[in-house]
UniProtKB/Swiss-Prot annotation:
It comes from Mycoplasma genitalium (strain ATCC 33530 / DSM 19775 / NCTC 10195 / G37). Residues 70-85 have a biased composition (Polar residues). It is a multi-pass membrane protein. One of its GO terms (cellular component) is plasma membrane. The chain crosses the membrane at residues 156-176, 202-222, 237-257. The keyword Methyltransferase does not apply. It is found in: Cell membrane. The lineage of its organism: Bacteria, Bacillati, Mycoplasmatota, Mycoplasmoidales, Mycoplasmoidaceae. Keywords: Cell membrane, Membrane, Transmembrane, Transmembrane helix. It comes from the Bacteria. This is Uncharacterized protein MG144.
């Protein structure tokens, strides 16, 4: 066969497939190029296959992001929300579950016990504290942080409780004697028997609850709880009991004034002489 009669083989120009990365969230068509006026699929090289895998991986990540809500989180330190850049098609909506959980955790986490160096540091308003605590709570936090203010608060509590205990201990002794007096010899006291019984019961109640916070502190100390004196819960308990006792002290004074204001000095002295055990 004559070699000159051989038909020459068609020369195919070498084409190079260039795959460009597309942004996430875009569906890519099949990769194909025309060869010799025919539509044929091109066999990819190793580098091109690796690049195609990376594109598919990016596509899967974009699909996952499309099924999720906006990835925002609650910053407990500053109280602000940080938004991330989302792929197209994803709505910018707040993650309510994450925000609720973060607020729940940040509400119960206590702030660091930092000793204020200056008065101005205690007067700076913290936006997170402003939203969560009232003015009384913020004042109590400042008092517990400052050693001088904390010592002054303990002195006020101690002296007030001593006055309350002394008042109601004397009132209990007097009322315990008054409720046993004869109505014939002491008619003025016998006429006020309901008030005397009420004052007697109030005295017992106040004396029984005035030491309850301190017993609680002692039990917590034995259980190994540290810094019981600086606990906000303990101070709430102490001040609530103290306010109740002060209110009952005022009520007792009003009851005694209403019961014995009509008596003159001689009758009051005569009634008080009944406390003498020699009589």
């Amino acid at each position: 066969m004559d070699p000159q009669n051989k038909s020459p083989k068609p020369q195919v120009k070498s084409t190079r497939l260039v795959v460009k990365k597309q942004p996430a969230g875009v569906v890519f068509p099949k990769l194909s190029i025309p060869v010799n006026d025919f539509e044929k699929t091109v066999t990819l090289t190793r580098a091109q296959k690796k690049e195609a895998k990376l594109l598919k991986k990016a596509q899967r990540k974009a699909n996952k992001l499309n099924n999720k809500q906006d990835s925002t989180f609650f910053n407990s330190a500053s109280g602000e929300t940080n938004n991330t850049i989302l792929p197209p098609g994803v709505k910018n909506q707040a993650d309510n579950k994450t925000n609720r959980f973060s607020k729940f955790i940040s509400f119960f986490t206590s702030s660091k016990n930092k000793q204020p160096d200056e008065i101005t540091e205690r007067l700076v308003d913290d936006p997170t504290v402003k939203n969560r605590f009232s003015a009384f709570n913020k004042k109590l936090i400042w008092v517990l942080k400052d050693k001088k203010l904390r010592a002054r608060a303990w002195k006020i509590v101690g002296y007030t409780n001593l006055v309350i205990v002394a008042f109601f201990a004397g009132l209990l002794a007097v009322m315990n004697k008054f409720i046993t007096l004869s109505s014939v010899e002491y008619p003025a006291i016998a006429l006020q028997l309901p008030i005397n019984n009420a004052l007697w019961g109030i005295s017992i109640f106040v004396i029984s609850i005035v030491t309850l916070p301190f017993w609680t502190m002692f039990i917590l100390f034995l259980m190994g709880v540290k810094d019981v004196r600086t606990s906000r819960s303990i101070h709430y308990f102490i001040w609530i009991v103290l306010i109740i006792n002060v209110v009952l002290l005022l009520v007792s004074c009003l009851l005694m004034i209403a019961a014995y204001a009509h008596l003159d000095g001689y009758n009051i002295w005569r009634n008080l002489e009944s406390l003498n055990p020699n009589n």
